[in-house]
Amino acid sequence: MVFSSLVFLCVFFPLQMLVYYLAKGIEARNTVLILFSLVFYAWGEPFFIVLLLFMCFVDWAVSQGIYKYRGTGKSKAFLVLGCVIDLGLLAFFKYTVFILTETQSWFGFPSVVPKIALPIGISFYTFQLLSYMVDVYRQEVPAQPKFRRLLLYVSLFHQCIAGPIVRYKDVSEQILCRHVDSADMRNGINRFVSGLAKKVLLANVCGSIASRTILSGAAADQAANLPTLENASALTLWLGCFAYALQIYLDFSAYSDMAIGMGLMVGFRYKENFNYPYLANSITDFWRRWHMSLSSFFRDYVYIPLGGNRKGKPRQALNLLIVWFLTGMWHGAGWNFILWGLYYFVFLALEKFLIPGLQRLPAFFAHLYTLVVVFFGWVLFYFTDFTQGIVVLKGLFGLNGNPLINLEGRTMVLNYVFFLAVAVLACTPLPRMLYHKITSSTNGAAIALGTVLEYALPVAGLVFSISYLVGDSYNPFLYLQF
């Protein structure tokens, strides 16, 4: 089940909200959230609910030992035990097939590589559990004495399977006591619907454009008369890569919007996960704005404990290399993800050590540099097959013997130019700024317009999104695969 499915929008979520507000008292409401979260998670993968419960129980038990023996060697031993179990399970499910496949390719064994399904959300909830145990060890929060409360934190369907990666210390008090007023409910609904519209009306269409131009297969669907990657014009490939860059931001930020909105509706206040990353003026700035919960996790639980910026430039560079290798691996078990992480390490290291003068560049050129680096980074990220990725990188400049511009490319650009302009605007704060300017104005006409927009936009967004979904096929969020 995904947030943008009809069964979720029309059955699951309304039923959850109804039962939640019929329940009396915080413990009863927490129980409602736990039960619905477990149903949500088990909907597509009933078996892996056992894994989620097991990891949560083990870490709950381990955290009791960490807290009981705080300040002693036993506390660290409990922490190491919990981390080994969590990371061991994550590595088994996420990287075993990759490692065995590479071993088979290089050395001829094993003869058969087993098929191991990746549990949905394991990368996200594992990091949440790790952050909880480390924070207990650091005595930033006490261990949660009640298992069901930790289970609520880990399994809450708003953010369990695709983030944001929520810190226990940020929601520990909200688990015990929450209040929702009319403004919270209104803001939550607006945020949820805006995320839904962003996903269904923008991200999905961008994905459709990308799939028509840079399909992950070696050749496009010939039945649809689409070109092969080798023969596609440079203009067509630029269009497809640009559409994918828009899709991955709109899709992932839409999920975060919906999660934050649903949290507000029941009193949870999750931190923002995106801050208009395509407005960044450096790669360093980009990663302060993109998937902020993941970036801050690696900063606080890997980079700083390794020494951060405190032990000289060679050590800083090594720490940075480790973090970005792990960032690439976190996103997927594939050489392209590792290369993508190392690609960003190179540019971040250049900015940090060799070209700090980048900050003195005129804003336009700094922004252009950032967009170019990010654009080619998404090409590396998209293609799990290096051969296809190289074909596309060459094709972007006509180095495959492909035309730079052809009729098909011009036609596709003309067909999608208006839509892509709207999608680009959605990647900026301009729509939100305009909305707030209108709704906060003291001008009579603006007040009337603001009142209409405040109620009409969410309704219109919901109606158009559901109408689109009625005739659409399954449309999962991109980050569910990580």
Question: Residue spans of the language-model regions?
Answer:
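Membrane-embedded transmembrane alpha-helical bundles that form the catalytic cores
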Residues: 1-481
